[in-house]
Amino acid sequence: MIFLAIIGTFIFYLFYEENINFKPQSISLAQIISFLKGNKKISNFALITFFNLLANNFTANLFIIFVSNYLGLKDYAGYLLILYFTITLISTPLWYFFGKNFSNMYLLQLGTIITIFGFFFVAFTSANNWELYMLVIFITGIGIGVDLIIPQIELADILDNNKDNRLSQIFTSFFSIIRKAAIGVAAGIALTGYGYLENVGFSLILDIPNIMIFYFIVPISIKIIVLILVMRYRSKFHVSVRG
């Protein structure tokens, strides 16, 4: 089971890790500021990217713990993790082909809504009705599939408007740092925070297990923030449903 869990974790990081071997030439701060002023989508999209990955990685880091300890499915945790990533992987090309007729941000909004809807059922899962968690895996797997492709396409579209390849490289690297920061922050808070509270026997909210706070309440709250940010982005930059 440990081997299966390792495989599942590897697949997850494979999705999000990026190769940034290129080394852009030096560029002035004035050019960067000028580019930001001329393309206000960058800062708004950076916030969406950070919080979206933050929410996703909260659940990814605590998946095994939630399934093993809270649902009591220790022997099946690795299989469920692989099932989740398999559904996500299968749904990714479907989002791509489906998305050809729609705008990127509309698809991201739709995927976020699907994820929030599916993840909401976590509130009703327990060791006595763990079967409900299979529905969570299926729905959220489809919703998260959009996060593996659409944000990258949207970023590419934003940077395509810039004729200076060096600036594009800098902001591609910048977004890579944002992604890695989100992964690191999520891992630090989720694993360290939850682990510490469990070790000292302290509950953040009375009658609510800490694992439900870190695995469910925090991520779904962040996802709702992401949904609001995406909707504001579409409204601010007049992004229609159709691409």
Regions found by a protein language model. Name each.
Residues I113-E131:
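C-terminal ends and interior cores of transmembrane alpha-helices
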Residues F85-P93, G184:
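Residue-level signature of mid-helix packing/kink "hotspots" within the transmembrane helices
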Residues M1-I64, S68-N69, L73, P209-G243:
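Intracellular loop-helix junctions on the cytosolic face of multi-pass helical membrane proteins
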Residues I90-Y106:
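Helix-to-loop junctions at the C-terminal end of transmembrane segments
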Residues K74-D75, N162-I178:
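Loop-to-transmembrane helix entry/capping segments in MFS-fold secondary transporters
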Residues W130-L148, E154:
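Hydrophobic core of transmembrane alpha-helices in multi-pass small-molecule transporters
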Residues L73-L81, N129, Y133, I211:
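Juxtamembrane helix-start elements in MFS-like secondary transporters
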Residues M1, I183-I208:
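Transmembrane alpha-helix termini and helix-breaking/packing motifs in multi-pass membrane transporters
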